[in-house]
Design a protein with these regions (language model features):
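Active-site cleft segment of glycoside hydrolase catalytic domains centered on the general acid/base Glu
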Residues: 81-84, 111-231, 243-252, 335-351
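Hydrophobic faces of well-ordered beta-strands that scaffold small-molecule active sites
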Residues: 28-32, 66-68, 99-103, 154-158, ...
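Aromatic-rich peripheral "rim/lid" segments of glycoside hydrolase catalytic domains that contact
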Residues: 43-46, 256, 275-313, 317-318, ...
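Bacterial N-terminal signal peptides
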Residues: 4-16
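Glycoside hydrolase catalytic-domain groove-lining segments
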Residues: 54-55, 199-205, 214-292, 308-319
């Protein structure tokens, strides 16, 4: 680590007014990327037995941020493309919530295991300058089209769970990261977000997102050394299934991140099962017994306790938000490429055993925003 580089990064963050966690706006979030799709397949949501619109319901329960993923050109689905995301942003704004737009920079899922380059950019995979240009122009153009409709997001993720090399070939590990290449790509995305301005002159906030608390500090240290530009928020995924850390260890890791980089963080992906059963559909669930932490059983009460403890962990570590991943991906007649139904219905915030009634764990939304 070059101390001068780190010092310059921290000075820039301070100069742009990075707020202390104690005074920063608190974000209570829900990732609703699947809602349009499952509603088209007949999904319904209830509170006290009455049918409810999920956007309006979550806003009433305290949510002020909706996270939405964006794929470049997903020819295998009509959802999570630009047209679908535009509809979702409109719904979020009607419900009075901010939007965090999550650019995957892929035609498919992007995560630590895979960061497949979009097909339209594949010919330039070995040219970092051309890739940076693609990222800049794509990000700029999407945000410009949204801005024309008054839908510029409040916050933008430049990549999703970018623990490994971005824009790479399929069936590659992405490790070790080529940081010269990665920095060009990331900085291009950051510049494009900074260049977008709403009518009031404001620009979207910028986030970089890493999966699992134990990976955040080393990743950002390497990014700073490589010259990756400042960001407004650090995004973190925390899933006990894939993390080596329990709650107290995760808190300690995130507290170090907050202090070392003097940048607010948000847990932008977290979920927990309320049962180990499924809804009887044809899609195997991703979160099973291997996803449980001691003291948090797969029950409605266990899910509620886990989420409210995640809120406490986040606040104690200096974080400013928690976003539940896919709380509304309930079972329906829709199919994924791996089965009919949902792979997540036991970890949503709707109890399929009670007609998709809102679960008690939704209380975390008000808890994260409490004074």
């Amino acid at each position: 680590m070059r101390v001068a580089v780190l010092s310059a990064f921290l000075s820039t963050c301070l100069a742009t007014g990075t707020a202390a966690a104690a005074t920063a706006e608190k974000f209570a979030g829900v990732d609703l990327s699947y809602v349009n799709e499952v509603e088209a397949c007949g999904a319904q949501y209830r509170l006290d037995g009455k049918l409810r619109d999920p956007y309006e319901l979550f806003a009433e329960r305290g949510a002020n941020l909706v996270r939405l993923r964006l794929w470049n050109d997903p020819t295998w689905t009509q959802y999570s493309n630009e047209a679908d995301v535009t509809r979702s942003i409109e719904r979020a704004h009607r419900a009075g919530m901010h939007v965090l737009l999550d650019f995957h920079y892929s035609d498919d899922w992007a995560d630590p295991q895979q960061q497949r380059i979009p097909a339209a950019w594949a010919a330039d995979i070995d040219d970092a300058d051309k890739l940076a240009q693609h990222v800049y122009e794509y990000t700029r153009d999407v945000l410009a089209r949204l801005n024309e409709r008054g839908l510029l997001p409040y916050m933008v993720q430049v990549g999703n769970e970018i623990n490994t090399q971005m824009l790479r070939a399929d069936k590659t590990t992405g490790l070790p990261i080529d940081w010269a290449r990665n920095a060009k790509i990331l900085n291009a995305g950051i510049r494009a977000v900074r260049a977008a301005h709403a009518k009031d002159g404001s620009s979207p906030k910028v986030m970089l997102h890493v999966a699992q608390p134990e990976n955040v500090e080393p990743w950002f240290a390497a990014a700073v050394e490589a010259g990756v530009g400042r960001v407004d928020y650090i995004g973190v995924s925390y899933y006990p299934k894939w993390s080596k850390l329990n709650m107290s260890q995760a808190q300690a890791a995130l507290e170090r991140v907050r202090k070392r980089f003097d940048t607010d963080f948000i847990v932008v992906e977290v979920s927990y099962p309320f049962t180990l059963r499924d809804a009887g559909d044809g899609a195997a669930n991703l979160l099973g017994a291997d996803s449980l932490l001691k003291g948090y059983p797969a029950t409605l009460q266990g899910q509620d306790r886990f989420m409210n403890d995640v809120v406490r962990m986040t606040r104690n570590a200096g974080g400013v938000g928690v976003v539940y991943w896919e709380p509304a991906w309930v079972s329906s007649t829709c199919s994924t490429r791996w089965g009919q139904g949902s792979h997540w219905e036991n970890a949503t915030l709707f109890d399929f055993k009670k007609g998709n009634e809102l679960t008690p764990a939704a209380s975390f939304l008000r808890a994260i925003r409490a004074p």
